[in-house]
């Protein structure tokens, strides 16, 4: 089942074009370009986004062409519809808006900042099932802690996502 061009086109014209809305129009599709953190950052600073969610076979290609819809893929897999993918898409964007997170500084050190995955996290107790929190994290030396976190981020990225390290913007 493919969503017909005239139905979707009328909806777009009634809601976006008629109101001179400057929001970006996005269609979540496995054919689209991969969605990355940098895209979430771009959308979080835009005038908003409207999402088209196809179902089963998607939407008529003419809608994509006529309304300059940006096709975005949420991963290398296929879902029955774009609704579930839209939750992840929106969450990645909304969490970057001012006031959404309690500590906005934490955004700077999480996965994909500097094209690195995030370092390991630890809580109390200091030892659990014979595994101890690394001594450097208990040292109070913030410079050494930052260095350890950076090293661990690089190790984890090399192991799980070496493709991220190929980007020339990554600082080892």
Regions found by a protein language model. Give the residues of each.
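Short, small-residue-biased leader/transition segments that mark boundaries at the very start
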Residues: 1-3
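Short glycine- and Lys/Arg-enriched binding-loop motifs that mark or flank ligand-binding interfaces
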Residues: 50, 71, 77-78, 126, ...
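SAM-dependent methyltransferases
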Residues: 126-172
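Internal, active-site/partner-interface "lid" segment
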Residues: 84, 96-135
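Alpha-helical scaffold segments in soluble metabolic enzymes
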Residues: 10, 14, 88, 92, ...
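Structured adenosyl-cofactor binding patch, chiefly the S-adenosyl-L-methionine
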Residues: 59, 63-110
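S-adenosyl-L-methionine/SAH cofactor-binding core of RNA-modifying enzymes
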Residues: 5-55, 60
